[in-house]
Amino acid sequence: VEVEQDGQQVKVGFQVIALSDTTFKSTAFIGGLPGAGWERGAETRTSEGKLEGDIISWTSEDGNVARSKLVEAGIGLINDDGEVTDTIPKVHRKSKTLGAKPPEGAVVLFDGSAESVKNFERGEAVLGKLLRHDCESKQKFGDHKLHLEFRTPYMPFARGQGRGNSGMYIQGRYEVQVLDSFGLDGKNNECGGIYSISEPKVNMCLPPLSWQTYDYDFTAAKYDADGKKVKNARVTIKHNGVVIHDDLELPNHTPGKHPEADSPGLLYLQGHGNPVVYRNVWVVEK
């Protein structure tokens, strides 16, 4: 939506997080939604929401209270008489790379078929043609590009690392976090973060139950004849079609799986006890 601020029209994007069946947190991103106007470090404002009947009362950081209710187009702001005076339209965001087709020569790791499940140790198809978390590819890769799609569950009563947690381990060595981080800051242990190494440039996480994408271009670490590392690994990653790490140097492996080595590595989709699922996983070797 556009609002007036200091005499100028300014775009504001809102993301609403469910914290239970009746409590919510709203973050207003001044400039637009993350990746569509708002950039890390720009202004945000938060409000706490409480549902009573069909009315949500929002209390802002400075104590102001506004009331709203759901309408067909989104969130309707209401006056003291319960009349809708304005509407914040709901936006359904979709990754630019959702449904990307593997190019000729790609290694298709999972396409929903029973045969492709066999490409993974502990591979298991669930909910029809989706790949369950906690599995690793049998094939190993050096320099490569990868596309995959993932979906986190709706867990409104969970918090932090217990909310839709999994992870995509490049070569089984470098974890790119998978988590329901919708509306959060985007830290290195949240969705899109490279665990313990780098936070994403912008938090592009979509709401839980939305299909999301990771696309990366990875160059493995290089070693000399004596097995000494002479060049760190590097990676560029897109989350939902937006670059969140741009030619990032990876100085070391991340915790939880395999150490760095002068050898190809597998794709590991971490199991963390939450029902995260994957689909459309393919690799292009470089």
Labelled PLM ranges:
Residues V10-K11, I17-K286:
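Carbohydrate-interacting regions of secretory-pathway proteins
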